């Protein structure tokens, strides 16, 4: 993940502050396997499919502690791996898990990447666009560092999609899922699939494949996860209520994490889905890039 670290972020109607140097918010720990039959494995599998036949230099923007890059070391050892993130703490963890220095990590903001133009054959983002203050600028940077003909693959939680649990709860005061995700994980953009496709296409990134995940079960999983985080963050909530929230959320969280994987492998439609996996190719023609 990446955003403007420790600065106030204007989300449209209020100022919001999120700390990416908090160890509790670091993403990307551990490693992934394609056979673990969960939502993280689904993202990895779809990414690997998107990159079949591509070689050279790969950059992951918003790499966190490096989970996806470590997985690529196993599944795609032929690639030269690079990662950047805005969090010093996340990169410190990534480097600690990179003793031989085979992955090149850099501190960098998605809105101002520390790389030359046309440097990478592949660029990846997982759960990044919803964190940045300017989605178009982040897409500009992707297009800038990606070589013509190169592949861009991303996963975006498009929580503004219609006919989803998130759309039903959009203005809910009882279950304000959008506020919970903003406060606890830094989601400051509520995007839609069409918005993302349009933003990428206008920057010369031709969308060649779009698939979907996080259908109903995945969203139920999310709601209970962030409800628990909200309850546990309140100092005035009694301990017994916090314990109850943990028990209830775990009872939902554990089965839905795996059941959602099977749901997403069966359901191909965009109906009721908020998870969007996009694969693009950078056009060769300089004139293809539109503002």
Task: List each language-model region with its residue ranges.
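Active-site beta-alpha loop architecture of Rossmann-like, nucleotide-cofactor-dependent enzymes
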Residues: 68, 130, 159
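Short, cationic motifs built from Arg/Lys/His that form the positively charged side of catalytic pockets
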Residues: 144-147
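S-adenosyl-L-methionine-dependent methyltransferase catalytic module, highlighting the catalytic core
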Residues: 6-39, 97, 133-141, 151-281
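A short SAM/SAH-binding and catalytic strip from SAM-dependent methyltransferases
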Residues: 122-133
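Conserved N-terminal segment of class I S-adenosyl-L-methionine
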Residues: 1-116, 122, 139, 212, ...
